[in-house]
Amino acid sequence: MGKKVIVLGEIRDGELRNVTFEAIAAGRTISGDGEVIGVLIGENVQSIAQELIHYGADKVLTAEDPKLKTYTADGYSQVMRGVIEQENPDSVIFGHTAMGKDLSPKLAARLQTGLISDAIDVSVTGGNVVFTRPIYSGKAFERVISTDPMIFATIRPNNIQASEKDTSRSGSIESIDVSLTDLRTVIQEVVKKTADGVDLSEAKIIVAGGRGVKSKEGFQPLQELAEVLGAAVGASRGACDADYCDYALQIGQTGKVVTPDLYIACGISGAIQHLAGMSNSKVIVAINKDPEADIFKIADYGIVGDLFEVVPLLTEEFKQLNIHS
């Protein structure tokens, strides 16, 4: 017997984030031959609802209101609670993002159910939904089965393969009547602190710098390499603490957890707190002058050398590859 799964979509700058498609794929695994329902909340979201169906949703529910244009826990939780009570799903899936990490525990607590967070894989064994999640800073993995009648879970970006887009798929798109009451938070303005670029949490390639960059200006070669690769720029806490870059770029135990296809660590020693945020990257390249640096212990490829010499060489080489391709 199939299961009913609700997936909350995430929208940024009018477009669906990749983690939404990955969450839909997880929902399809859980549902079997059941129903996957996508939920889109915001302003003018009807226009992108069909894309969820193309990636595997059977039905999409849209909630539109000017007050929902920017995420607030009050507004989104009211909408989601109404949807959950109406649909009575077996599972509710979120991305393990800033929004998902804020909203999912609030809803789970209000609905008196458990939450499985930061899952990197979903499977079904013997009729049970099994979530795999990292523990001990990624040194081990646990497989979790929930005994609650309704499962809440968050999915780490870049770990579950999204389904191929199928424009031949069809499904229903329905609007939800929105009646927001007692909103304690109203967003008046959003000021972006960092420049527009590739989103760090969903980036396929990341170029990260540590204390070895030595200054704010030291990040310039990394930014040039990132631009050539179409990558995001990240940093260790040491670089952030030294005021070489903004804390929005921090990767690690107290920063963002990332799992890109390629992670290039430049001048990063490899403190355990940093490794906790990037050790599950598919391919790790380390550049460091110290041959004994801990980062080399987990690197797939290591370059012992001065990053200010190595990184420009890599940048030039990739430029040539781009030209010839």
UniProtKB/Swiss-Prot annotation:
Annotated positions binding FAD: 262-290
CDD domains referenced in this protein's UniProt entry, alphabetically: ETF_alpha (cd01715)
Cofactors named for this entry: FAD
Entry's Gene Ontology molecular function annotations: electron transfer activity; flavin adenine dinucleotide binding
PROSITE patterns per UniProt: ETF_ALPHA
Pfam families listed in its UniProt record: ETF, ETF_alpha
Cofactor note: Binds 1 FAD per dimer.
Keywords noted in UniProt: Electron transport, FAD, Flavoprotein, Transport
Keyword Hydrolase: no
SUPFAM superfamilies for the chain: Adenine nucleotide alpha hydrolases-like, DHS-like NAD/FAD-binding domain
GO biological process terms on file: fatty acid beta-oxidation using acyl-CoA dehydrogenase
Keyword Transport: yes
InterPro entries tied to this protein: DHS-like_NAD/FAD-binding_dom, ETF_a/b_N, ETF_a/FixB, ETF_alpha_N, ETF_asu_C, ETF_asu_C_CS, Rossmann-like_a/b/a_fold
Subunit annotation: Heterodimer of an alpha and a beta subunit.
Entry function: The electron transfer flavoprotein serves as a specific electron acceptor for other dehydrogenases. It transfers the electrons to the main respiratory chain via ETF-ubiquinone oxidoreductase (ETF dehydrogenase).
Family, similarity comment: Belongs to the ETF alpha-subunit/FixB family.
Identification of the protein by name: Electron transfer flavoprotein subunit alpha
